[in-house]
C-alpha cells in the first residue's frame, strides 16, 4: 500500500482484531479451562516485518524453520543436547500448523531420515507451502489469522524460480533422485544445497543460534527463523522469535519397557512426547470400529466439543 494514511488505518484495524480475539469463543474456552480471569489478562502487540521476497502476487521466504535446542527423539548418533530443526519452504505458519517438514539435526545435516531412502523421500517431503497473497489488501481483518495466506503447490514455487539450492529432482526414468534442479521430474524439498553442499552455512548458523540462545536464557530454547537465499549464493538468516522450553516435567527417567503391560491403561508406539498432567479428572474415549469413515470426523469433533463443554460447565 503506497498511501501511508491507508497503511496506518489497516495497521490499526489489525491491532484491534488481535485485541478482539480475546473475546472469541475459543479464547474464552481456553481461559475457562486454564482458570484464568480475562479481566486480569494483559496483552502487548508486537509489529514485525515479514521475512521474504515478492514473487509475482506471492510473498514468502525460501526457508522457514523452528529450531529446538533439546531433541527428545534423537536417532542414530544424534544427541538430545544437539537440538533439532524443522525446515520448510515458505511461511513458517506451515510448520506451526503441522505441515510436512524436513527434520534435521544442525550437527548432523547429512543424516536426514526422510531423504535417506527413495520411497521415503517421495512420501515424506513437503508438497505444499504458504505464501502471503499480495492481492489480498483489506481492512476487513478476520478471526482466522491466515485469511490472507495462500496454500500453494511446489510447482508454483518452481514457476517462480524459488527452489534454487533447496530442491532435488526425481528422475522417473532412472528411478533416482538428483541433487539440484533438472528439467522434468518431480521437485522434492530436500534442502541439500544448504545442508550438505555448503551453498549457505545454515547448519552452522543454527548451531550458533541455539548456543547463544540457550546461554542467554540459561535453559533450552525454541527459535523461529527464516532465510532468503539469493541466486549468487548469498542470503539472510533472520531470527523471528526465541522462547524458553519449559521441560521440567518432560524428562523421562523411567525405563518404560520394564512396565508390565497388564498395568497399562493404554499403550501406543506413536506418541507426542513425555509429560505429566496431574489435574486430569475426566477422559473422553472415542471408540473406533471397522466401519469407521474419515468423512464422519467433523461430526465426531462436534460431539466431543459438546462433551467438553459439559465438563467445563459442571466445574
What are these regions (language model features)?
Residues 1-315:
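Nucleotide/phosphate-binding sheet-loop regions of phosphoryl- and nucleotidyl-transfer enzymes
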